[in-house]
Amino acid sequence: MKAMKLLPVLALISTFAVAQEIQQVPAEQAGKIERKVTEALGSPTDAPFAVDADAEKSAGIKGSGDVGLLAIPDKKLTVEKVAGAGREASALGQLWMRNVVPAVSSTAPDAAKLRTVTVHDGDKDAKVEVYFLGISKAEGGDVDLGLYAKDKEPLVKVPLVKTNAAASAVQIALDGRKEGENTGVLVITVFGSYKADITVTKPRE
C-alpha cells in the first residue's frame, strides 16, 4: 500500500458522540479525500458488488474530534435506479467512517466483522472503515439501504424512505444529529427526497 498523507483523512471529523457542531466538507476537499482513500482500498476481490466511485460527487461531514464520514456515490447511480431497485442488492456507493461505526443491535459491532483500511504516513497510520452501500427492494415493495462490511450480507439494513422533500440532483448528502452520550444518527439523503437514518456509536475499545 502506498504511503499517503493523513491530514486530509483526519480532517474529516464529525460530531456524533463527542462533538457539538456538524459542518459540511467542501466538495473539492471531499473529492481529494475520496481519491486518496479509494487508492488505499484498491479493488477488493471479496466486495459484495462493484462500485465505480465518483470522486467529483463525494460528500463529507466534519466537526470537532477525530471522527469522520465520507460518502461516495456510484457513477451509475440514478433516481430511476433507486426507484426501480430489485431484490438483489445493487450499488449505491461507498461510505467511509473513522472512529465511529454503525450500531448493530444497539451496540458497536465486533471489529473483526468490519472492513478496515489502514492509511500509512511514515510512522503514523489512520484506520478507516469502508462500507459498500447497496439498495434492494424489501418484501413490501419499499427500498432498503444496506451497509456491507466484510460479509456478503449487510451488517446493517435500514429503510430508504421516499419523503415529500423536493427532489435534487445531488446523489448523496450526509448530515447527522447527536442522540445519546455515545450515539448519534447519521442521515443519508439520496437525490434530495430519499432518506435513511442509521444509528452510529463509538467503536469498541
Predicted regions and their residues:
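Bacterial N-terminal signal peptides
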Residues: 5-15
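Mid-length scaffold segments of soluble, non-membrane domains
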Residues: 84-152
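Primarily secretory-pathway and cell-envelope proteins
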Residues: 19-97, 117-119, 153-205
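N-terminal secretory signal peptides that target proteins for export/translocation
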Residues: 1-2
